[in-house]
């Protein structure tokens, strides 16, 4: 509910704390679960014991760089890019291949423009929310527009922006390319999920793993860096046939996704976690997958 401050003529949302609280709980939940899941190194694959083409692979473990065949719920060795688990990586928790690949998609998400705004507000309350006075003792960059004048709230500490160690956030524009590669990898996993022991079919997890790269694609291709890559550094879209017909069309698609960046950020985050949960439960035998193979 918006309430008007009669002294400053500002509109202030009395429930401003709900959004950062939900973000805090959501991100902490995902970090806790994904860390636990990556630590396991087992039960991330299901094919009902069949070793032919096809099966369900958790997105947390894709691609499977190494495989420890002694663990339950792991793919056949021919799915491994580099063979069995090497001794020189025995120090990794759980001897889990997830540690070798999660760094790439997580670096993209962690440095995402939306997520930066989200966790700055949720974890450091800097700023706590739009048009909300800063928390006492914290630096702030919040500004309010009052009667046409911009008045910065003064918390007594200087706000320096993303400087110093926070400059590493600039890796986002490079992590973006790895994120795009992972969309194709997970799309192959979705294709793989349509088969079991070489037989075509459909299961519940087939649909889950198919939706996963779609949501990740909507999130990734709505990225601000991709939008700049497509439409940035141009003064005129219609100055050439290429820019008019191709660049502008691509830019409009990316802009459509960009306007829904927050939505797809959360949908894709929740769905990738849900995908791992389902594969894990089926692989452990806790639930049965409903599928056309009858297994």
Language model features: what each stretch is:
Residues 217-295:
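C-terminal transmembrane module of eukaryotic multi-pass membrane proteins
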Residues 1-204, 252, 260:
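Membrane-helix and juxtamembrane interface regions of eukaryotic multi-pass membrane proteins
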Residues 183-211, 272-295:
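Hydrophobic alpha-helical transmembrane segments and immediately flanking/interface helices
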Residues 25-30, 173-176, 212, 216, ...:
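Alpha-helical transmembrane segments of multi-pass membrane proteins
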Residues 110-119, 213-229:
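Transmembrane alpha-helical segments that form the membrane-embedded catalytic/substrate-channel core
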Residues 168-169, 208, 257, 272:
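Residue-level signal for helical boundary/lining positions with a hydrophobic bias
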